[in-house]
Amino acid sequence: MATPQFPEDFKCPISLEIMTDPVILSSGHTFDRSSIQRWLDSGNRTCPITKQLLPQNPSLIPNHALRSLISNFSFTCSSSQSKSSPQEPDPQTLISNLTCRSSTPSLHSKIYSLDQLNRLCKSNPFFRQRLTESGAVSTVLNFVGSEDSRLQESALLLLLNLSLDDDNKVGLVAEGAIGRVISALRYGKPNCKAYAATMLTSLAMVEVNKGTIGAYPFAIETLVSLLREGKGRERKEAATALYVLCSFPDNKKRAVECGATPILIEMVNSGMERAIEVMGLLAKCREGREEMGKIDECVMVLIQVLKEGSSRSIICALAVLNSLCSHSEEISLEVRRKGVLEICLGLAEDDNDKISRNASNLVQTLRRCLSRA
């Protein structure tokens, strides 16, 4: 059976791709939000089609009718294609397997349905929308609390795919996802813990969720515990989650209070780039700087990064040292004694603009501290 063709009206005039978030410009034409936003962000102030001059701050009005049409068409196509082949399950049947109250599906049936829904959700934003509107999310969240690790893992992966859309990130938090995910983070098998940490990262990509997640009981504490006790992938995902969450000011202090600093220093010493990035955020708060100042090996680990680290790690290490030296003459003198000024003078000539700029900033900080001494 041939793949159904989407009507041309469903395609964005800029990207020529099927629109996932159609919006109407004041000229009356509809575009995909991401495409027209990039057009406007580039400084364009005319309609791409009519060349009509737009207001200083153009409004983008959601085209709910067209979005619904595209969603229905996409879902119908998925269903019809599924029915045409015995290998392809019907999406509506998969959803019904999860939400039907008149029967209790077997464990195998639940896992199968979740895995198939995962496959569909991963590549189809309209199916993700349909699934969230079906009422199945609450059932999937219940599966996250399952004692069966296979069911828990499949449910976490489905939530992760649903969270690809920003609207769903907010909606999942409203549905109570944080508590379920943190429970999996605390008590799940290693693979489930890694997925749970990744899920928190995804939810925290929306600014409004960062404070909510950070303030949730055991959230930051459990991520720090995973840094301390987890293995490779679990530690990496926990560090990434902390990196995203700690861009929110209150979460920096929470991470420090939960004991993240010495663990991060140990991870930096073992070569994990994400750990030095988290340290870069913690060094922006007083509590983080004070904690780093108490740890004897902190400065030496950072100096070692300057000598042997990746470009990204060097950029972060320079920023951390600059923050520490700006607030502590004692650390500034220690850093100078250990030859950092000479290292920075060399790095100031680096071809990487960020390394050069950060090195120059640290040189200026060290010289200011010397003049005050």
Which residue stretches match the model-derived regions?
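Alpha-helical solenoid repeats of the armadillo/HEAT superfamily
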Residues: P105-N118, D148-N161, A174, K189-S202, ...
